[in-house]
């Protein structure tokens, strides 16, 4: 962990020498969060630091990195015994991008596995509910990150619609904090900007421990006049299949409204998982069928501070349980070295 923390510090200073001679300024952003959860009476707490570095150089090159320092504090026996904690540090991604044009970006290094939308687009400071979906590990094993290369861009771009694509290959890696599976896959989506609708599909071929396929579909709807966000995913693998559907609404008449009440956001999510006939080792999926609903409230305070609370009820043959969560999240953004400017 000490080695990883040193690498995180080094990355935060990476852009300083090159940016002094360029207009593009490396930016350090990310989030600091504290999460609490009670699942069936078992309480746990998670402090999280997730710094993100974006360092452009030249007209076509970009370095991107996100690290995560995560703590987990819980009772030793679940619902009894003294509290104990562990801390771990890892890199979610550390990648070099070559931006050829709007149709092609080439990435090498470690990157978030682009299966559906949750893994790439909903980090801790954006996700509306702190618990990830049950089907999250489908298409993202072994760590949610891939080590290899990726290409992405707009296949077709029109003012009224566009088609985006992503394709990648990942090598198997067992290095501490940099684990990944050997896999290949891709994603394609269609975006309609006037309606705020995007739909797409994902595919992955996992190439180790017995090759198998995973596939999925997603939808995002953000109608421009209304402060409503709707997101959904479906995913299937030999270990099971399922879906989640989530809606979030700011209590405002439009997206441009800014009042104390408009900072309040109501959230609801339903999800279902059906176990498969051929579970794979290390797929981290339930061994029984599961249904769950969650409701929550987010309040966005000034200065990038957010409060979150939610309640969920999980139903399965292994037993029903109440799931309570709360979180406080601070999002930061500033130049990567003292005296820098945007």
Predicted regions and their residues:
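Outer membrane beta-barrel
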Residues: 23-32, 40-172, 180-182, 189-196, ...
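Outer-membrane beta-barrel biogenesis signature
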Residues: 7-43, 255-264, 332-342
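Positively charged n-region of N-terminal signal peptides that target proteins for export
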Residues: 1-6
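Outer-membrane beta-barrel "beta-signal"
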Residues: 151, 247, 320-342
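Transmembrane beta-barrel architecture of outer-membrane proteins
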Residues: 47, 90-92, 171, 182-184, ...
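C-terminal hydrophobic structural anchor segments
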Residues: 253-315
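Oxyanion-binding "anion nests"
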Residues: 200, 204, 208-237
């Amino acid at each position: 962990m000490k080695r990883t923390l040193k690498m995180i510090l080094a990355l935060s200073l990476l852009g300083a020498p090159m940016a002094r001679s360029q207009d593009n300024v490396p930016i350090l952003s990310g989030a600091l969060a504290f999460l609490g959860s009670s699942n069936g009476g078992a309480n746990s707490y998670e402090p999280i630091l997730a710094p993100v570095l974006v360092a452009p150089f030249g007209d076509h090159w970009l370095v991107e990195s996100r690290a995560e320092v995560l703590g987990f504090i819980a009772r030793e026996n679940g619902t009894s015994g003294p509290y104990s904690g562990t801390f771990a540090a890892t890199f979610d991604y550390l990648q070099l991008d070559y931006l050829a044009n709007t149709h092609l970006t080439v990435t090498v290094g470690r990157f978030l596995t682009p299966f559906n939308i949750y893994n790439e687009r909903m980090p801790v400071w954006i996700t509306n509910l702190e618990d990830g979906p049950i089907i999250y590990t489908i298409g993202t094993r072994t760590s949610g990150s891939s080590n290899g290369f990726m290409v992405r861009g707009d296949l077709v771009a029109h003012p009224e619609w566009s088609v985006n694509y992503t394709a990648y290959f990942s090598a198997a890696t067992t290095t501490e904090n940099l684990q990944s599976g050997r896999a290949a896959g891709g994603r394609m989506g269609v975006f309609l900007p006037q309606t705020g609708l995007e739909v797409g599909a994902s595919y992955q071929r996992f190439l180790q421990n017995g090759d198998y396929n995973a596939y999925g579909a997603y939808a995002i709807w953000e109608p421009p006049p209304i402060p409503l966000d709707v997101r959904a995913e479906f995913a299937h693998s030999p270990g099971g299949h399922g879906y989640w559907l989530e809606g979030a609404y700011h209590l405002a008449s439009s997206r441009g409204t800014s009042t104390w009440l408009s900072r309040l956001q109501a959230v609801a999510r339903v999800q279902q998982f059906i176990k498969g006939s051929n579970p794979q080792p290390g797929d981290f999926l339930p061994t029984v069928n599961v249904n769950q609903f969650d409701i929550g409230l987010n309040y966005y305070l000034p200065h990038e501070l957010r409060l979150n609370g939610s309640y969920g009820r999980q139903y399965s043959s292994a037993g029903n349980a109440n799931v309570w969560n709360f979180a406080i999240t601070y999002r930061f953004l500033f130049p990567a070295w003292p005296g820098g400017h945007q």
